[in-house]
Amino acid sequence: MAQQTTLQEFNSVYPKLEEALLDHARSYKLPQEQLDWYKRSLEVNPLGGKCNRGMSVPDSVSLLLEKPLTEEQYFQAATLGWMTELLQAFFLVSDDIMDSSITRRGQPCWYRQEGVGMIAINDAFMLESAIYTLLKKYFRSHPAYFDLIESFHETTFQTELGQLCDLLTAPEDNVNLDNFSLEKYSFIVIYKTAYYSFYLPVALALHQLNLATPSNLKQAEDILIPLGEYFQIQDDYLDNFGKPEHIGKIGTDIKDNKCSWLVNQALAVATPEQRKILEENYGRKDDEKEKVVKKLYDDLNLEQRYLDYEEKVVGQIRERIANIDENDGLKKTVFEAFLAKIYKRSK
């Protein structure tokens, strides 16, 4: 019987990994002041999140094996999970600089913390390098070592492609709704979010257990990429229609000129008059203009459009899960667990 990991259990692995990373830096005789800086970055940036991506690795390994993990299996899976969290930290530190963000996880963004500034760019590079330090230390003799390295490299590049498309499509200081399209939106969410948040953790679990056949990876991708797209569309929906006390933040997609699912849906069905309203009010840092856009979303019945989309896409995902070929060790339960976590979520 598979066993779900807890955040406490997952967190308990991190100090050993942090020490391994600091030891690696010490091997180059890094001066103490810089070592302390690296330690602080490793304790601020990867920690403090929900760790959903990271915990998906041990959860998936346990579901694939259909039993609780041994200590060694758990350590390996959690280590791979922490590598996805380091990847996420690398992206977030960089994104926050690019977006001029103010806070992250309830604290000032890393680049806004005292004395950090643009040194954060180098810190982001070091967080990425940490992945490969840990891979070499703990997986050098693993049969899938090469595939694990390639998985991280490829997923990193895919995410950077999504980020590039996002930055060029929706700059905060230049509102041009002609840039937006559902095709661009789909590219952004698939590459910027779905690959590293949904596909990568399961691919890592399959590699850990030497079950990463081309067929298994393809089946996983065919389910997890649409699932990741659904997750992001849900996020966009909650940004406008969710309750701030549920989602833990006040939605800012309208003011931030985000190429979101809702604005693309609005553009697809708006009359010329309604489009003019969008062009005059979208992407402006103004409460009244935001209210005008929100009212337009209501007038266009976007909430119902989302609910119809949700039922359709979840039906398609369930059908794909039901058709999974389990002969090479893949398990339907892995995907059912992902879907159960996000279907009808309110935060």
UniProtKB/Swiss-Prot annotation:
Dimethylallyl diphosphate binds at R104, K192, T193, Q232, K249, K258. It is an enzyme of class 2 (transferase). Gene3D superfamilies: Farnesyl Diphosphate Synthase. It catalyses: isopentenyl diphosphate + dimethylallyl diphosphate = (2E)-geranyl diphosphate + diphosphate; isopentenyl diphosphate + (2E)-geranyl diphosphate = (2E,6E)-farnesyl diphosphate + diphosphate. Pathway: Isoprenoid biosynthesis; farnesyl diphosphate biosynthesis; farnesyl diphosphate from geranyl diphosphate and isopentenyl diphosphate: step 1/1; Isoprenoid biosynthesis; geranyl diphosphate biosynthesis; geranyl diphosphate from dimethylallyl diphosphate and isopentenyl diphosphate: step 1/1. GO terms for biological process: alcohol biosynthetic process; farnesyl diphosphate biosynthetic process; geranyl diphosphate biosynthetic process; mycotoxin biosynthetic process. InterPro entries: FPS1-like (IPR039702), Isoprenoid_synthase_dom_sf (IPR008949), Polyprenyl_synt (IPR000092), Polyprenyl_synt_CS (IPR033749). The keyword Kinase does not apply. Mg(2+) 1 binds at D95, D99. It is found in: Cytoplasm. GO terms for cellular component: cytoplasm. SUPFAM superfamilies: Terpenoid synthases (SSF48576). Mg(2+) 2 binds at D95, D99. One of its GO terms (molecular function) is (2E,6E)-farnesyl diphosphate synthase activity. Its cofactor is Mg(2+). Its EC number is 2.5.1.10, 2.5.1.1. The keyword Kinase does not apply. It comes from the Eukaryota. Isopentenyl diphosphate binds at K50, R53, Q88, R105. Binds 2 Mg(2+) ions per subunit. Catalyzes the sequential condensation of isopentenyl pyrophosphate with the allylic pyrophosphates, dimethylallyl pyrophosphate, and then with the resultant geranylpyrophosphate to the ultimate product farnesyl pyrophosphate. Belongs to the FPP/GGPP synthase family. This is Farnesyl pyrophosphate synthase. It comes from Fusarium fujikuroi (Bakanae and foot rot disease fungus). The gene is FPPS.
